[in-house]
Amino acid sequence: MKLSNIKRIHFIGIGGVGMVGIAEMLINQGFNVSGSDLVKNKNTIRLNSLGAKIFIGHNEKNVRNSDVVVYSSAVNISNPEMKAAKSLNITLIPRAEMLSSLMRGFQSIAVAGSHGKTTTTSLIADIFVRAKLDPTFIIGGKILGQENKSILGTGEYLIVEADESDASFLHLNPEISVVTNIDNDHLDYYENNLEKLDSTFLQFLENLPFFGSAVICIDSDRSKKVFETLSRPKISYGFDKKADYFIKDLKQQATFQKFKIIRNSTGKEISLELTLSGKHNALNAAAAFIVAQKAGINTKVIKDSFKNFGGVSRRLEFKADLKIDGKSATLIDDYGHHPTELKATIEALKSTNPNKKICMIFQPHRYSRSTLLFNEFIDCLRDVDTSIILDIYSAGEQNLQKISSYDFVNALIEKKKNAFFAKNLKEICKILESEIKGNEIIVTQGAGNIVDISNSIKAIYK
């Protein structure tokens, strides 16, 4: 069956960040698209306005008359639409397989990694847009100042974020693959086996054609080992001075950072200015720089992009300046939900605001991750002045480990840290009004529905 022979494509979980861009591409190419999700959101509303038939709630009737059903990694095998598609012998594929089909005919770039892939993909997309290459891109977050998470361009490049959480990125067939880092996340899928995680990343990179390029950060031991093992053409980057491209002379300012990228083979130095803060974002920019260079984009265009990049939604995003009982505070929102990401957030905020206290409102994400990385989370949260811990966001998991947010609070209090549990917005506000003394930073941190809390705090205190 050819893709051109397909009439109706149905998406289970169509409102998810990884699904909406693919669905939009298919609509723009003339396919009849339908999809279901548990709740209406901005993505489902947008797709409906473009012509997709949207169902709220999952029902076996929704997949009838479909030629193909696409599901995301968040969809459980017990989903009634999954079951119906199987019983009706409808072709059932993961989102990455559909994305792989769409990548054919493009010069494609895929960005993978445990952390930083959304920002890196966004930086690459912004550079290619400014270079007037009119790329198509599908990103797991929204570039601030831009309406959509996906754009269907007319150029030859397709830039995508690759999902390693369930190894579905192995379906992809890019010509340039980026790995920002490899860390101990999604180990529930990888059977708590880090070697299996490493080998899956290696397989992703080995899938490159012989004329392709792998771009890999070697600052972590795991990604460095994968780089050394890889047989495909490869380029390394990082703060490590042995990397093919390394960063030096990083200077953090209040609203931007400056650094140099050195090409090891020639010693050539490029001075860059980036609107994003934090060492982790300098690394993300280095990856984007190398990809843009591989595409032959002028250095001036790259510099212009970095200097004017608007940022990515929920990645150290400035929300508002607040007044809480007359005391000033700055509200920041961040998607990070792994200890490495929390550490990067805290370090970035401290480097730009060395004299301000930090209050982190943290919503742990998944019982499995909270249990496995509990000690690492506590080590990170010790570095903020006040922690407000919300209920763990289950993301559909059962609490087999019997872990509670009180475990976080009690562990922090044992370490003489200022920590609280909050059940709801009212309790959060009560704590903020008691604890915020003025000239502080409040960070809403997590991958669940904490963005709603952030928006509510903004509405109350702005």
Predicted region positions:
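Phosphate-binding loop of NTP-binding sites
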Residues: 2, 25-31, 48, 61-64, ...
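Nucleotide phosphate-binding/pyrophosphate-handling subdomain across enzymes
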Residues: 2-10, 18, 22-29, 176, ...
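NAD(P)-binding Rossmann-fold cofactor-contacting core
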Residues: 32-46
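Conserved beta-strand positions in the Rossmann-like core of class I SAM-dependent methyltransferases
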Residues: 34-35, 136, 388
